[in-house]
């Protein structure tokens, strides 16, 4: 009898064969599923605590996606030779998996849940993120935890005007779209995408196509659960205290209504804190008078939050003005200033209402490119975008330090939005780093980073293909009634049902991200949201074009200049020298940065034009070929009885025979030449062994109008 009750489900999914297994590995976890997609293998596990911690008032879900280097047949680098802190890719994939899972846990479920996905084997052509998301969904489904799944996911490419399901890496490179969509049988929950200025209908079509295709995976998970699922947990939400709800509503509703008539964020926030504090204090006072225990502040806070949501959502659905007085389609006032920082290469201050981004662009050389050691192999990235949001941006105190998951995710979204409109490396050879410092935040700071990033790049002289703007949309959905909100505030994000971010140019979409807090939305709602987002984006693009018509034609005086020369690839080793000695001396002595590609393209960069010219001259000398008939100013290295060894170029010497020094007979060479002396010579012969014969006499004869003496054999 086997130790294992192993259940296996296999299905064909697009061009890939998928295998789901449970019951053999990680049996002590609440749920564990092994997913194999054409040799990319992931193990997804989930463990749920049997009870919530006392006083817990939020859902503590953690998702960790971990890539093991052995999966690609590698040993980790570093002193310890083991995996360390998560890479940016691992962090982004963890967020990608978390986002569609989180809204499917029932309200009031506060037990700690941890989802861990290990990448165990990698086929370089099959990205592991979709198998990981499918595995996490399946592990939750078989665990018996209260979870309204399963979730399916799919990657969609757009090649030759056709959608491609779960493309290979090579197909992704040729595609104008890289879109990941996740959802349930009924609706879409999450979208993450990067596109090359595609129209809205193509983007929507990709989402719908992905949702249709993921049903195959959802069906397979259902079958796996039927045969290998654990019993469902007997969990019920804590009963609501209707009396407490009624009393909190009675005490706080008038004050909350008044607070949401205040248009200024800081003043409104102060008023809301006062309402929360006063309500809790009044309830404690009443409990003390009655000799009972007061409701804990977390419970009261949750009731007040629900009451806030009801007020704000009700006002919007009934056609009343939004929190800050706008209607559903209006973008907040925009102010733009470029060239803000005098010594940076490019900078912009982009302000939209109470959201503000100070964005800086820096130009570098090929040596500044980011080297990324991925499972699929090492590669370089010439464009970096980093997003920072310090606590002062929201008027709060807090930790300052390394970027959190949210900051990494927002930075990647802004990067996705801009990368399609960057010039190619052939057009603009610089590496580029954009840093967005969020100095104020009240909603949609990632989209402010897109707008500010585009403006900072143009200020730096980067020839962008087009202006790029981004906008965040919200949704209020109650039954069959819904309202799509343009340019959402932070409070509308917290109290609403959707965060839908769209970035692009006047031609089309470059990035789209959608997160749904309810159990999915329909195609019709997405259609309305995309159309309204385009309207808002065009408005912002108009403001940006008014402020900055196009990229600066001159780079900042503080940015490095570049020149490019082509050398014989066989001469690369001469420029580098033994152990890098030659190129190291070149860069140090000329104050330049020198990059050499395998095809012999040499890029010299410096803020000093004289240093660049000197480096160029020296490289040309190192790689130059000695030609018969050329005249050189050489240095006498060594005197011999029969002539002198003369250095013509770095590493290239020739023989000046005693008979080629002057026309008369030379008895003692020391009468004519000394070591270290500069002498002008002409190349009169070279042979297949690289030996070079020189003549000074030939130049004397030419000056006197005589013909050259024939070279000696």
Swiss-Prot record:
PROSITE patterns: KH_TYPE_1 (PS50084), S1 (PS50126)
Record-annotated S1 motif domain positions: 629-697
InterPro entries: ExoRNase_PH_dom1 (IPR001247), ExoRNase_PH_dom2 (IPR015847), ExoRNase_PH_dom2_sf (IPR036345), KH_dom (IPR004087), KH_dom_type_1 (IPR004088), KH_dom_type_1_sf (IPR036612), NA-bd_OB-fold (IPR012340), PNPase (IPR012162)
GO annotation terms (biological process): mRNA catabolic process; RNA processing
Entry EC no(s): 2.7.7.8
Record domain KH: where: 560-619
SMART domains, per the entry: KH (SM00322), S1 (SM00316)
Cofactor: Mg(2+)
Keyword Plastid: no
Catalysed reactions, semicolon-separated: RNA(n+1) + phosphate = RNA(n) + a ribonucleoside 5'-diphosphate
Name used for this protein in its record: Polyribonucleotide nucleotidyltransferase
Organism of origin: Burkholderia thailandensis (strain ATCC 700388 / DSM 13276 / CCUG 48851 / CIP 106301 / E264)
